[in-house]
Amino acid sequence: MTATATATATATKPLTGRRKHSTARVRLIAGAGTHSINGREPMEYLKRDTLVMAAYHPLTVANMIGKYNVIARVSGGGLTGQSGALRMAIARALVREDEALRGLMGKEGLLTRDSRMKERKKYGQPGARKRFQFSKR
């Protein structure tokens, strides 16, 4: 394998990001800046501007918009979780491309896994925290 073939092969190896119950696998390929999530346009898939902006925030921070094609495969959870998973996967992929971005991404908190999960429902009450109505008499 030549050096350019090796660089292309590593550039297309997917990186994973997770949030809540969602998982995103992202491939970054140097190109014109086209994006697809599960074969669809980001706005068509995520449906809200805020989720699209949050998902592609790492590209904005690194000033790399229009320099990479992003191909993402997302599964599990809801749209917010998928957007967060996509954000982390893109940040990890950018750091793999350019190690100098690690400090910048770290300061923005883009490389840290958000460990918050849904709290379980407890027995003897209707939800995780809510209690049944108390009657004194």
Regions found by a protein language model. Name each.
Residues 2-20, 24-75, 80-137:
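Structured, basic alpha/beta domains of bacterial-type, RNA-associated proteins
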